[in-house]
């Protein structure tokens, strides 16, 4: 495991260097005390992972994510409705390749009367109870904001329960305008325009996340292979023992 941590740390340092060379602004790059969190761009082949993550949320976390008491059927229907071609969905995986936190950036395109396009986005996030307090929501929000800038979205809308203080704090810190309506609060953030630096940053962060995931996947497969070898050895030893008797 020490070797794996060394490989991941080396990969992180190289990615930091590439981000600096690309001139990525500080608001898109963690400071020296932060961990560069690998955030994967989820695809259709991750549907089972997404559903497993959402179903593992407790009742309170489901309430914070969806704004209502969602049962398993609601979650299943939500997962089926995901549009991977239109929207962007991100996930943070642990070493067992299970999603700890995920974000959904829904992209909306509206055609104005003058035939121009107006692009907006809506942000939703969920975090498993175990890693809470590690800043994963903030990291996911930064990643979503990066893509929203590159996708030429003008605004990001966040619907959050008024009791969801951490999410509202992140939105307020980013400069969003908050409007409370009873138990819900709507946060509207004007998105700065993207540029070459943000586009390069998105390419590098995606590559870092993909490489990190591949390392974790290889390690998991390697340990599974070792377990299989151990099982075979036990079977051979047991067979020899029976033959000797």
Regions found by a protein language model. Name each.
Residues 127, 133-148, 155, 169-173:
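Conserved acetyl-CoA-binding loop-helix of GNAT-fold acetyltransferases
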Residues 37-52:
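A short beta-loop-alpha structural element at the N-terminal edge
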Residues 1-37, 160, 166-245:
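Terminal substrate-recognition subdomain of acyl/acetyltransferases
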Residues 98-100, 151, 170:
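Structured alpha-helical
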Residues 67-118, 124, 128:
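Acetyl-CoA-dependent GNAT
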Residues 108, 137, 176, 180:
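Basic nucleic-acid-binding interfaces
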Residues 122-133, 161:
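A short, internal acetyl-CoA/4′-phosphopantetheine-binding micro-motif in the GNAT/acyltransferase core
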Residues 61-67:
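A short gly/proline-enriched turn/hairpin at secondary-structure junctions
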């Amino acid at each position: 495991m020490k070797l794996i941590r060394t490989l991941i740390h080396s990969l992180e340092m190289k990615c930091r260097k590439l981000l600096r060379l690309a001139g990525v602004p500080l608001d898109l790059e963690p400071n020296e005390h932060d961990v560069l969190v690998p955030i994967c761009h989820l695809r259709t082949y991750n549907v089972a992972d997404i559903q497993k993550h959402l179903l593992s949320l407790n009742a309170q976390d489901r309430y914070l994510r969806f704004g209502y008491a969602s049962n398993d059927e609601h979650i299943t229907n939500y997962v089926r409705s995901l549009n991977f071609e239109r929207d962007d969905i991100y996930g943070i995986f642990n070493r067992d390749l299970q999603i700890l936190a995920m974000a959904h950036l829904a992209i909306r395109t509206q055609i104005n009367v003058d035939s121009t396009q107006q692009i907006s986005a809506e942000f939703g996030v969920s975090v498993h109870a175990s890693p809470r307090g590690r800043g994963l929501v903030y990291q996911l929000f930064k990643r979503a904001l990066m893509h929203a800038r590159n996708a030429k979205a003008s605004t990001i809308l966040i619907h959050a329960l008024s009791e969801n203080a951490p999410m509202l704090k992140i939105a307020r810190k980013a400069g969003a305008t908050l409007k409370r309506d009873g138990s819900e609060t709507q946060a509207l953030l004007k998105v700065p325009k993207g540029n070459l630096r943000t586009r390069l940053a998105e390419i590098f962060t995606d590559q870092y996340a993909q490489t990190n995931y591949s390392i974790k996947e290889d390690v998991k497969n390697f340990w599974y292979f070792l377990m299989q070898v151990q099982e075979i050895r036990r079977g051979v030893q047991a067979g020899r023992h029976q033959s000797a008797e």
